[in-house]
Amino acid sequence: MDSRNVLIIYAVNVERKLNAAAHHTSEYQTKKLVLRRGQIFTLKVILNRPLQPQDELKVTFTSGQRDPPYMVELDPVTSYRSKGWQVKIAKQSGVEVILNVISAADAVVGRYKMRVNEYKAGVFYLLFNPWCSDDSVFMASEEERAEYILNDTGYMYMGFAKQIKEKPWTFGQFEKHILSCCFNLLFQLENNEMQNPVLVSRAICTMMCAANGGVLMGNWTGDYADGTAPYVWTSSVPILQQHYVTRMPVRYGQCWVFSGILTTALRAVGIPARSVTNFESAHDTEKNLTVDIYLDESGKTIPHLTKDSVWNFHVWTDAWMKRQDLPHGYDGWQVLDSTPQEISDGGFRTGPSPLTAIRQGLIQMKYDTTFVFTEVNGDKFIWLVKQNQEREKNILIAVETASLGKKISTKMVGENRREDITLQYRFPEGSPEERKVMAKASGKPSDDKLNSRTLNNSLQISVLQNSLELGAPIYLTITLKRKTATPQNVNISCSLNLQTYTGNKKTNLGVIQKTVQIHGQESRVFLTMDASYYIYKLGMVDDEMVIGGFIIAEIVDSGERVATDTTLCFLYSAFSVEMPSTGKVKQPLVITSKFTNTLPIPLTNIKFSVESLGLANMKSWEQETVPPGKTITFQMECTPVKAGPQKFIVKFISRQVKEVHAEKVVLISK
């Protein structure tokens, strides 16, 4: 053959801008092409001469971190399909050939090498595709796709059910190295497993946790001197970028940080995801669908008996996908949780667990549905432990059937507001459906289950949980209800602790005891504790603290006892931020912040910071101490590097006051 007639590939143009716009991947900060499976993309091939009918033109795609690789070989001349892929010649003009390639809707996701004949055309990423109706992560609503795939900022919801606080969070799934980091973490999957969002999401969930050899190390000790305190993080980006560069675990995280990086990773690879908060979240170590709390007669928790716990809140991630591994009816949202709590198949992970199975009490549906069901549905039993002639006697004094799994929350689609999604997880408390679900999950008849969790107390107790301005005295309003109006003497005992959101008690603040005579069918009792009992202990651990405890009321004549618990979160409002509404790329803008120390103690280890995806780096400013009553003002100059609406988060942090923040969206023009 005349060498002048040999077909030679001079170049392959992957039409990066054109394809990225069509595939909703323009925001990824990588020089490589990013595509979504099941959708057409275009290649422009430059030849040494016009293509002729007898010429052989083959396009080969290979992927996989294990041998043998996943390989697809296509012939645009014949247009035959291979593994669901197809290529066609869309246009031919002289030495230019335009190829339209359609990848399979169930193709392996990950990095691909592309070759046209012997010409190496580079590397691209192939993602799951919620826009493709044949993809198992298909999501029909454009508004939901914009939120759960494309939105790179959002909120975590924290606090407790009666005082929900929002924490701005930057997911940053399009930032530099994030996509590469996510696919690097999937090395343990076989090539064919990379087709399946169930297996990919479970693997990503596993690898977010350093205990499994992954990204983030959990720590709830209050000592974070050799890392970053969990409450300091407001973005997934520095965590995943640090792990990508160092290949070492990042220190430290707690549940909302694990959810943040998991949501980022899932959105990055194309699986719709949302961070979800469950308030009053049960941790049932015995898997008996109850949380058992044991108290002494003053209301103090007995640690060696109390193995279960109730977290003020717990944050996990929901991912959207079809469950082709389960019977019909379990598609849609699935719970995934990277927080290291329980071992599942040899590693710390939870899910994916279908919300429909959780709601129906079908705890046998994989994965880990029993654990999630108890978090949102369990009953809380409070036991009084009495010492009687050197023997302990446990007396059940409270059964709470509606105190766990409250106000399950996520960011609303298209709005910077909280959405309550509790009814996606469970039927209304006390409804016939809820009783049937509890019976199904527990394996007991519904009547038996209902009776076993009912106490016929003549006295009922509740507490009004007010917010607590940091530095103010503690005020508790106890309400006692009964059927009789006969005067009765009642002993009240309230034990309060400074503790973390998981219920981990750092110090006991004291016991308030009071004997009152109640009249009528409803009475109120007021308990107080001076701020000095807690204010000097705020800096003892590097965690955001709450006040929590139990209250026991005893009718003196009959000895009948009832109990309830209380939680108080601190508020601190002496913080203001001023920043412009508009700015320009590469032109400095000034942010001014003021903070007043209203406490009677000095604040130490002060740090102000400004974060935004519109900035090249986080900006920070530090000061050792702010004396009582002192106001400090700082100005920080920031230079935006990205155009468009950019969210700026300004934070104040100290050893005693953990994270006060403000946020504002600034419109940055070119």
UniProtKB/Swiss-Prot annotation:
Keywords: Acyltransferase, Calcium, Copulatory plug, Glycoprotein, Metal-binding, Secreted, Transferase. Ca(2+) binds at N377, D379, E429, E434. Binds 1 Ca(2+) ion per subunit. GO terms for molecular function: metal ion binding; protein-glutamine gamma-glutamyltransferase activity. Its cofactor is Ca(2+). It catalyses: L-glutaminyl-[protein] + L-lysyl-[protein] = [protein]-L-lysyl-N(6)-5-L-glutamyl-[protein] + NH4(+). Expressed in the coagulating gland and in the dorsal part of the prostate. Not expressed in the brain, heart, kidney, liver, lung, muscle, pancreas, spleen, stomach, testis and thymus. Homodimer. This is Protein-glutamine gamma-glutamyltransferase 4. It comes from Mus musculus (Mouse).
